[in-house]
Amino acid sequence: MRADLAVSYGEERLPRYTSYPTAPHFSPVIDAGTYARWLSELPAGASASLYLHVPFCREMCWYCGCHTQIVRRDDLIAAYQRTLRSEIALVAETIGRRIKVEHIHFGGGTPTIMAPEAFAELMAAMRQAFFVLPSAEIAVEIDPRTLTADMVEAMRLSGVNRASLGVQSFDPIVQRAINRIQSFEQTAAVVDMLRHAGIAGINFDLIYGLPHQTVASCLDTVRRSLLLAPDRFSVFGYAHVPDFKKHQRMINQGALPDGPARHDQACAIANALKEAGYVQIGLDHFARPDDSMAVAFEERTLRRNFQGYTTDQGEVLLGFGASAIGHLPQGYVQNEVQIGAYAQSIGASRLATAKGYGLTDDDRLRADIIERIMCEFSADLGDICARHGAEPEAMLKSASRLKPLISDGVVRLDGDRLAVANDSRFLVRSVAAAFDAHLDPGKQLHSRAV
């Protein structure tokens, strides 16, 4: 990507578009009653994906942007697990039938902070409440520093078949600056343990733009990671938002790479992974050519949801736990963020919905366009608009932010078909943002575009 474009567009604060509209536009107008009605209206034959949020960690990583908190007492974790089980039963009862489940994802926080038997009980509760297909993908986010052999065995017995390992960086200087000391040897031992247990799908999460990070240290992390041969990589740019995440104030802002340096790091990582045979997928994922995500990318069936890129084709995502977000045909719902408020609602047999968003026809049209841009670096506006009963000319007229992108060669427009230039793919969020009718550039709610 041209360095001048990285400077002119890369500093913009834009959504990652894991939803449209994005979470800052959720409103308390959508409440527990709305969610209950939406659940009861799910069409017969609908299948779902499940997301379970476990908002606990043993220590705080200073770069973290997730909803989590430090916990020392195991009884608090056990109580939260019981609340999750109650919420699962409550949602299933509200739906009124045992719907099919094709994907389950445990996120956090650190989901593997639960006791192994508690994890197994939670999986059993889901299988009782829903019909989890034998082919379902069951994925768990893992902190390699705290994973135990007993938890791996519980995961194996529960049918887990994919694990996402937080790596971020193997550079000890960077690790000290973000309060996450994690050796290569620790990570390698966990990968070996998982594979020995038959959990074959291995993802690594890497981050660029961290304090004291350089192109050389990023490439060294990639080199070491490749020795462990994960199936997928997620490569994110660090989002420094200390006004929203107070613990990020522990990071020395003066040690953060500037925009051009972030661009160089992102390009270096991408080039190294592609040279190693991985397929670049969308904004921030890389996968082996035979991986299901690479196949979905090639077949143009890739989707995007709150976990990032996914092969999940479902239109229903049920979120469980404090702060969890769900997606239904009618719109989005988000649970109470505070654990106490969440537990109080579920304890009273009430859905814990705090806010959400009801989709309009225009939202659905724009969401489809944005998702295709984010997943394929292109969009056939004529085809998408026809499916929604809209005119592509009107949509293009409303996308005034496209004009400079076209002038700068970031985007090519051939009739109604839009495509992001190959050397500008890191700016795909800027292209998607052209179709975002809710975006307020004056509000610094999101991370840098690069």
Swiss-Prot record:
Pathway the protein acts in: Porphyrin-containing compound metabolism; protoporphyrin-IX biosynthesis; protoporphyrinogen-IX from coproporphyrinogen-III (AdoMet route): step 1/1
All residue ranges annotated as the Radical SAM core domain in the record: 42-276
GO molecular function, a single term: 4 iron, 4 sulfur cluster binding
Keywords, comma-separated and alphabetical: 4Fe-4S, Cytoplasm, Iron, Iron-sulfur, Metal-binding, Oxidoreductase, Porphyrin biosynthesis, S-adenosyl-L-methionine
Location in or out of the cell: Cytoplasm
GO biological process: porphyrin-containing compound biosynthetic process; protoporphyrinogen IX biosynthetic process
Protein name: Oxygen-independent coproporphyrinogen III oxidase
